[in-house]
């Protein structure tokens, strides 16, 4: 009976509005109630995403559809501070406004759940995908490199580190909702090898580094420019770049799986201009140029001009960077 129920839930379309049962040990999930913030209701009605900002018990947060986080259930979490709610609504609205409603309703997680802290001590997760249905974000976010919130309305466009991490997580959650990988996209590059080629390059790098340091024992690893000029570093970077060009990947790690490959393409497309993508990724790789055409066409089938979103992001981010004092 349980196996049949799991299979049923796994195959449900997002728009079927799943309600987990007590028998599965999962807290019931509902849509926003009639007294919810109008902005929360609007995002739910338009995109099928419920922006949540409060939990009454840890199980309500750490138990999702067919997924639970036992570690944080033990370590604990803190509710979002009430005065931060407008900020997370701004962030959510900005993100969702860059996605077509059809695509979000078909593939996005059911919930964005914002908290002050998720986990404790060594088990803190600034951005956490809980299964394919709940994306948990700490706010203010402590992802390494994330910036303080100074302009809540435009923070989505200003904190590229946080936004990159969010889109990577969303990419994995989207893939989990697909019936199968995008066949044409996969065929456009080299077959995934579970990271074998990429890890081989890493192993060679370690050996080359060890040999170089034996010959240069007084080298200063704190000088970033000097480190990047070392022959073993240049060799490694060139080898990874070649792996990516030949395979149609954005990063070396993308060679592991469709999930990683799709997630990196998604993140790039929704945050970068066509001009920069063409210059940095397409002009030097036939495989990437082909995969670009296939994946952008795929998104357009759901009414999503993802490149337009990327063009906008680059424009807004550059505007923000230009406004900063020199040196920032």
Question: In which residue ranges do the predicted regions lie?
Answer:
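Acidic/polar, low-complexity intrinsically disordered N-terminal segments immediately downstream
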Residues: 12-103, 284-328
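Auxiliary, metal-adjacent structural segments of Zn-dependent hydrolase domains
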Residues: 85-136
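Lumenal/extracellular "mature" regions of secretory-pathway glycan-modifying transferases
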Residues: 124-133, 137-154
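Active-site recognition of the HExxH zinc-binding catalytic motif
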Residues: 143-190
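C-terminal motif of bacterial Sec signal peptides marking the signal peptidase cleavage site
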Residues: 7-11
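Sec-dependent signal peptide recognition
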Residues: 1-2
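Metalloprotease/metallohydrolase-associated module, dominated by Zn2+-dependent proteases
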Residues: 195-328
